[in-house]
């Protein structure tokens, strides 16, 4: 009967939930640190205001948000945009925030290779997206149709990329 107690089941579910929550917190706090570099006052920095609002939406504690704004000048974080091709030529734009660009790019290249996707040269995917002014995200100019198996492969690829600590957002045209 090992592993069948109610507490073991609750503990297992809680571990999974806490891990996802922790990953979300670290990604949101990195976004705040990068946004606060321009101006640490959210009244004059709309990007920071947006990042703080999103963090509050995910119930990040106020202490953590304030600490991230204070630390914005300490660590040298930079934004990286990576372009890739997924199953059936679907286009991907991966945005990441990192303190070591080479490490992050190599780790993402490795994930792409292991999942059967291809790293693309800068600009080779971006042409098929538009940068929207509202939420500063990428919207595809056209949709790529995928069959069921390729759609499943793309979902697995996106999940693998989202597990990477430095990856902030992933945009696809599928």
Give the ranges of each region predicted by the language model.
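N-terminal cationic and glycine-rich segments that engage phosphates or anionic surfaces
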Residues: 1-139, 174
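Positively charged, low-complexity, intrinsically disordered RNA-binding extensions
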Residues: 119-120, 126-174
